[in-house]
C-alpha cells in the first residue's frame, strides 16, 4: 500500500495532516504502508514518524532537520567536502566579539547571513565597518527575541547572477537568475532578477554536477540549491551557496508544471522500489 500525505498526489490511501499534529491513526497507516509520500512543507513530527516506521519515504528530508538553517547547511557542506565560499560560523554576538577583539576585524567586503530566512531577506553585502556594526546590532536585537546565529562569508563576485538547480526526485532542472543592475547584490527573482534558461550550458552542467554530488552524499531529493561561479580565479569551479527546501516555481514554468514534474518523479521513485 502506498500512503500519501501530499494533497496533490493521490495514492492507495490519502491522509491530510495539515494544521494538526500526527496521531495514532496516522502511525497505524504508516505502519501498514510500503511507501509514504510526504508534503513539501512536512513538519518534523510527521517526518520522523514516517521515517522511523516505514522503509521508503519521499522526499528525503534527513539533512533538512539534522542540519537546520544556514549554519547547519555550512556544516553539511564542510562534512561532505562540497566547495562553498570561505565561511565563519557564529552562534551569537558574544562568539563574534571573542573572535574579533580590540582592533582586529574581518576583511571587507563580506557577506553577513543570519541563520534563518530565505530569498535573500536575511543576507547582506557589507562594504563598510559601519554597515557591519549595523548588522551586528540587528543580530543582537534578534537574540533578544530568541533568534540567534549568523555567518560571515567571503564576498565572491559572480557576475550578478546565480544558478538555481532544482532537484525533484531523479530530475534536475537548472536556470540562471540574473540581475541587469550591475550594482545589485541579490540574484533572486523576488529581488528583481530575471530567469535565463539558455546561457552557458557548460557551466550549468558543472553546477548540476556539484548538486548531484551533494544529493548522492546526503540523500536530498527535493530542494532548490543555489550555486555561483566566481568571476575571477577559477570561474569553472562552482561554489554552493545554500539549500532551499521551499523554492519558487517561476523558473520551472509555474506551479502547474512543477507539480507535473513532481508527480512523474514520485511515480518513478515508487516504480524503483524493490
Annotate each predicted stretch with a short phrase.
Residues 41-44, 63-64, 172, 178-180, ...:
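Short glycine-enriched loops at secondary-structure junctions
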Residues 2-91, 98:
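Conserved N-proximal alpha/beta basic substrate-recognition cap immediately N-terminal to
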